[in-house]
UniProtKB/Swiss-Prot annotation:
Entry's transmembrane regions: none
Family: Belongs to the GlnD family.
Summary of the function given for this chain in its UniProt record: Modifies, by uridylylation and deuridylylation, the PII regulatory proteins (GlnB and homologs), in response to the nitrogen status of the cell that GlnD senses through the glutamine level. Under low glutamine levels, catalyzes the conversion of the PII proteins and UTP to PII-UMP and PPi, while under higher glutamine levels, GlnD hydrolyzes PII-UMP to PII and UMP (deuridylylation). Thus, controls uridylylation state and activity of the PII proteins, and plays an important role in the regulation of nitrogen fixation and metabolism.
Activity control summary: Uridylyltransferase (UTase) activity is inhibited by glutamine, while glutamine activates uridylyl-removing (UR) activity.
Species, as recorded: Burkholderia lata (strain ATCC 17760 / DSM 23089 / LMG 22485 / NCIMB 9086 / R18194 / 383)
Domain HD: 443-565
Protein name per Swiss-Prot or TrEMBL: Bifunctional uridylyltransferase/uridylyl-removing enzyme
Keyword S-adenosyl-L-methionine: no
GO molecular function, one term: phosphoric diester hydrolase activity
Region Uridylyl-removing, residue ranges: 325-681
Matches recorded under InterPro entries: ACT-like_dom_sf, ACT_dom, HD/PDEase_dom, HD_domain, NT_sf, PII_UdlTrfase/GS_AdlTrfase, Polymerase_NTP_transf_dom, UTase/UR
GO annotation (BP), single: regulation of nitrogen utilization
Needed cofactors: Mg(2+)
Length: 858
């Protein structure tokens, strides 16, 4: 609101009149969705309203009221700022200041978000020379009312001072900096329709640059000048129209300026475009795919246009650097360029050859505008005949099999849509978002991220990131089979049905068509089928159980398959979201790999031999720490076989050293240390067992912001609980060594209390989880041996969730034997091994499942 006195009745009447007219326009837009008409009508409505206020303020005819920025362009979105310039003559009466201030205040009273400046012509030119943002807004200045002569003088002086080359350089730099803020990708979960790469601002930037250079101010004019083709002009207009419509609809839905396509509005925005949910895809996912395709096209065409404008503003001082392929390609200033516009039409096989040359030629850093345009206009050439051409299939395999440059080549193939033209099923998942609370990338971006992760394992400069993976891939023959598996592992997402099974068929067809040897083809197809198997076994099953390992080893079959699956699994999890991977998951997978490898090598996965081996290793470690030879017996005699199978030798030794003097302790023993795997805290609890113990410990962790990754619960023969937890702090940059003592003292004190368990705190869900909640699921079943019951819980992640589950179990006096907490982005899939009287009773099972569903509901 303005800083002046309260609006007069007349001002309030005008405001109501303006609002009613605007509301009618927005209603027409809701019905007809003609965004150009809406923006023009809003601009005209605003013009007329400001003219009336200008006249009422009695401002002299020597001044001019000028619309600048988007308003000057005549493109007002429903709740955009209205940027105006009050243009003053060089000599003016200072007494005008009060009237100008009154004018601006009355403009605010209309309900407009006014952005105003008051300057002389000279001040405008000076400000523009210092600030490219001011220079840009003035580029589209339009007189609303006032002195025509003054405005024309401003226009002449402005264009005389405008340096097209300097403006180009500044705007391109500004665009790069803006893109960097959005991680240089249009594929954001919540893109900014205006500012993100491929958004409206990119289109505006091109037109600003072209206008400043005198090349035109519309796509039609750029087409006439030869900077773009008719087809490109149509594509630009079509995508610009979609983005403007989407932005306007966001404003209307939100009832305010809203340029971010946030989760909360994606479903409503999708419905406003007529999208409806299907069995395979949400309405929001369909809208986001349309948006990503538009942003991708804008990015591609913007690259072509900017290079073309640059070539005209900065004529090259040197021509061809070298010939790369006679009659096809040359290198020109570090860019791969076709020798003429008809290369791809004469030689369709040159399309894929371009990417092979880009990948293998040192010094080539990209494709020239001419090459990009030719690719863009070669879509009809990339047909079934082209896909089936043996030479093209050979070139595609050569691209996959190069020692370096693969990731960059495939990203460029995707950006130019060539990859989707060659692999039609890949085209189906380009821009497909997965609102599963797990993946934060579109399916095509996730696939390329997995490919990139596998490639990094093989690159020496990145060997320090995942040394074990780098070691394995260094000895893995024909690693390109992993790249093919990466390309196909999620290619069938969104089709309905099991994507692993559907993807197998696609992979099998690809291998057959590309002449891949039968043993390599079998591995590729198997990897696509089983790409989720290893993570499910490691994160959801009891890998201390020899039977689990034996079954997994039977599925894998041999070392090459195991290594391939391990490398693909690590790359896949790391490619879902920056938040999903952690060292604990890495440890689970590596342990499963090593144990399975031993079994494949002939080791017998029976409990007795494993028990003996771990005990011997633990005793050796205890001797190194000068623990008396037989001191361990007081504790070990009270432990069952399960304890020794659930913990490795180092863990057994640590717990023994802590507890051998306190086997019959009257008070709780709590010890904490930074987890040996890093990025976590290991907490040991030893105390007389009771039904609510697990829940009480979880309550403490919940209240103190500690998330449980893993829980291993044991009960001694003389009634003590020996529980181990791996926890992480929700705050970043925590030093676990610093909080270990605090956890020991506080948790030990908490365990002495006899107060009833507190009510769980239902922590607030993230916006993503609130917008795309998953249906909570609870499944309770007996294990294969009938010894325990397995409880599986799937729900939206939130603070307090684990404690809510534990409290229900405690109320029914059900003991938790083990817990595997699996957090997948915004979703949890937890597994509990339960023991308790009455669990075989169907009525108790139904009651338990009902109460758990109520406890985990959002």
């Amino acid at each position: 609101m303005s800083a002046h006195a309260a609006p007069s009745p007349e001002a309030l009447s005008r405001r109501a009149e303006f609002k009613a007219a605007k509301t009618e326009m927005l209603e027409r837009f809701r019905r007809a969705a003609n965004v150009a008409s809406l923006m023009h009508a809003l601009s005209k409505l605003t013009d007329e309203a400001l003219k009336r206020v200008w006249d009422d303020c009695g401002l002299p005819a020597t001044l001019a009221l000028v619309a600048v920025g988007g308003y000057g362009r005549g493109e007002l979105a429903p709740y955009s700022d209205v940027d105006i310039l009050v243009l003053l003559p060089d000599a003016h009466d200072p007494a005008l200041d009060a009237r100008i201030e009154r004018f601006i205040g009355m403009a605010w009273d209309l309900g407009l978000e006014i952005g105003s400046s008051v300057r002389t012509v000279a001040q405008c030119i000076e400000e523009a020379s210092q600030d490219v943002t001011v220079q840009t807004s003035l580029l589209e200045a339009r007189r609303i009312v006032g002195s025509t002569a003054l405005f024309e003088r401003f226009t002449v002086h402005y264009h005389e001072a405008l340096d097209a080359r300097a403006f180009f350089t500044a705007k391109v730099l500004e665009m790069r900096q803006r893109h960097a803020k959005f991680q240089d990708t249009p594929y954001s979960l919540e893109p900014n329709v205006k500012e993100s790469p491929g958004g409206l601002r990119d289109l505006q930037t091109i037109l600003w640059i072209a206008r400043a250079a005198g090349f035109g101010s519309s796509w039609r004019e750029l087409d006439t000048r030869g900077l773009i083709t008719d087809r490109e002009a149509r594509e630009l207009r079509r995508n610009e129209g979609f983005l403007k419509t989407l932005r306007a609809r966001l404003h209307v839905i939100a009832g305010r300026r809203q340029d971010m396509l946030v989760f909360d509005l994606q479903t409503q925005a999708a419905e406003s475009f007529g999208y409806e949910p299907t069995q395979a895809k949400r309405a929001s996912e369909q809208l986001m795919r349309r948006y990503y395709w538009a942003a991708k096209a804008v990015t591609q065409l913007a690259t072509i246009l900017i290079q073309n404008i640059e070539a005209q503003l900065f004529p090259a001082t040197s021509g061809i650097t070298r010939v790369l392929s006679p009659d096809r390609f040359v290198e020109k200033q570090g860019m791969l360029e076709i020798v003429d516009d008809g290369v791809f039409e004469r030689h369709p096989d040159a399309i894929l050859e371009a990417f092979l040359l880009y990948e293998t030629t040192r010094g080539v850093k990209g494709l020239s505008a001419r090459t990009l345009r030719a690719l863009y206009n070669s879509r009809e050439i990339m047909n079934n005949t082209w896909r089936r051409d043996p030479q093209n299939r050979d070139t595609f395999m050569r691209i996959l099999q190069q020692p370096e440059g693969i990731t960059h080549a495939f990203r460029l193939m995707n950006q130019t849509s060539v990859l989707g033209r060659y692999l039609l099923n890949f085209r189906r998942i380009v821009g497909q978002m997965q609102h599963d609370l797990y993946h934060v990338y579109t399916v095509d971006q996730h696939i390329l991220m997995v490919l990139r992760n596998i490639r990094r394992f093989a690159v020496a400069e990145h060997a320090h990131e995942y040394p074990f993976c780098s070691q394995l891939i260094g000895n893995f023959e024909r690693p390109w089979v992993l790249y093919v598996a990466a390309l196909f592992h999620d290619i069938a997402k969104g089709r309905g049905g099991d994507h692993s099974t559907l993807g197998m068929a696609d992979a099998r067809r690809f291998c057959r068509e590309h002449g891949i040897a039968s043993d390599d083809a079998a591995l590729i197809v198997w990897l696509v089928q089983h790409h989720l198997t290893m993570s499910q076994v490691a994160q959801k099953q009891d890998t201390s159980d020899p039977e689990v390992i034996k079954r997994f080893a039977e599925v894998v079959g041999n070392e090459r398959y195991l290594t391939a699956l391990y490398l693909l699994t690590v790359a896949d999890i790391r490619g879902t979201s920056p938040k999903v991977w952690n060292t604990w998951k890495g440890k689970l997978l590596e342990d499963l790999y090593r144990i399975t490898l031993a079994v494949l090598g002939g080791a017998n996965p029976d409990a007795h031999s494993e028990l003996k081996s771990r005990q011997e290793q633990a005793l050796a470690l205890l001797r190194l720490e000068t623990v008396p030879d037989d001191a361990h017996r007081t504790l070990w005699d009270q432990l069952d076989v399960g304890f020794f199978l659930r913990h490795d030798a180092a863990d057994i030794a640590w717990q023994t050293r802590v507890l051998y003097r306190h086997v019959n302790a009257e008070t709780a023993i709590v010890r904490a240390r930074p987890s040996p795997i890093g990025d976590a805290l290991q907490v040991l609890v030893y105390v007389k067992d009771r039904p609510d113990l697990f829940a009480g410990i979880c309550a403490y962790f919940d209240r103190n912001g500690l998330s449980v990754l893993d829980a291993r619960v044991s009960t001694t023969r003389h009634g003590y609980a020996l529980d181990n937890f791996i926890v992480t702090q929700t705050e970043r940059d925590v030093r676990y060594r610093d909080i270990a003592n605090l956890v020991e003292q506080q948790l030990a004190s908490r365990l002495t209390e006899t107060a009833p368990l507190p009510e769980p705190s239902k922590g607030r869900l993230s916006r993503l989880s609130r917008t795309f909640p998953i249906t909570p699921r609870v499944d309770l079943r007996a294990d294969e041996r009938g010894q325990y019951y397995i409880l599986s819980v799937s729900a939206n992640d939130r603070p307090g969730l684990l404690y809510s589950i534990a409290r229900v179990l405690a109320e029914h006096r059900i003991g938790v034997h083990a817990a595997r907490i699996n957090t997948l982005g915004e979703r949890v899939e937890d597994i509990f091994l339960l023991a308790g009287a009455g669990l075989s009773d169907n009525r108790l099972q139904i009651q338990l499942e009902t109460e758990l569903l109520r406890a985990i509901a959002v």
